[in-house]
Amino acid sequence: MKLADLSSPAFLENPYPLYETLRRQGSFVSIGPNALMTGRYSIVDGLLHNRNMGKSYMESIRVRYGDDALDMPLFQGFNRMFLMLNPPVHTHLRGLVMQAFTGRESESMRPLATDTAHRLIDDFEQKSSVDLVTEFSFPLPMRIICRMMDVDISDAISLSVAVSNIAKVLDPAPMSPDELVHASAAYEELAHYFTRLIELRRAQPGTDLISMLLRAEEEGQKLTHDEIVSNVILLLLGGYETTSNMIGNALIALHRHPKQLARLKSDLSLMPQAILECLRYDGSVQFTMRAAMDDVSIEGDVVPRGTIVFLMLGAANRDPAQFTDPDHLDITRKQGRLQSFGAGVHHCLGYRLALVELECALTVLLERLPHLRLANLDTLSWNQRGNLRGVNALIADLHS
């Protein structure tokens, strides 16, 4: 197996057959010098919780793009994001942002998420059909993260396009030269936009996420301007692309399992459990990476120091050694912890907010449009990403 397999048309349409092959081939598969891949649940879980497995983002860039890419502003910008860093720097930056994503703060966003879902449906409810991607699943999390950042909602469309163009940076397989050009231009556009916004917040601070980072800086927890810009872009990317794609993935999974959908419609109190099962079944986040900071022993194998390990979360979530009948959606499943949010010190910061948004979005949609039917279920166009997986369009007949 090689990295190029993770960018093949077959994989991007349906990664799960390749994941099955990956698990069968062993605990680890070599995909290059000092680079391994694993899709087994126990290995993924063990390495995510191992403190000797850290981040080495620029080394992962070297593995995928070569030495010449290391100085590119795009990758330098991503390297400043706390998602890519190790303690104590990671701990410092994550701590600054964490206060906005506590359980209490995330739960306080439930009324906003519910109201946003209702308002979006108000705009298309009388139509006979609608593209749920453009009219619902993409604007919902974007409006919420824009509110949290106090970003003008009129800028949401241009921001969403730029964010989508940088999202492929997080793919396991390298981008094409053209994709790299587009991603670099999009990062520059976002950096310019937020530089201007940061200057405005310095002059007139508020209670938003950007002002919070600036206040932390003023209180002695120094951040450089570039660190603030990079981490604001990370918050936008994490708060938008992951959830928007997951709303669509959940709807697809439920409609492909009509008995499960019917059960959920009959008892919406099952929604939190159903969301977790949809995340396991076909999550938008498909992989993450770790680097061995020392030799790491796990289940009889040794990951040598300096090795980059591609942890295929989507494969772990379908591992039959962990989940009974893993290729079947079961919204009452109470078996095992899903890997979709990662684990350990780099566990997804915004997972509570994501769950709130997903629960509100699907609950309101099923309440308001109980007869909704997906019209293009057999002709879906996936977004051609190995990570942040989702569809380009999701056409729904609203009153079938």
From Swiss-Prot:
Cofactor field: heme
The entry's keywords: Heme, Iron, Metal-binding, Monooxygenase, Oxidoreductase
Entry binding sites for heme: 348
Any one GO molecular-function label of the UniProt entry: heme binding
Leading EC class: oxidoreductase
Stored Pfam families: p450 (PF00067)
The EC number(s) this enzyme carries: 1.14.-.-
Family under the similarity heading: Belongs to the cytochrome P450 family.
Name of this protein: Putative cytochrome P450 133B2
Annotated source species: Xylella fastidiosa (strain 9a5c)
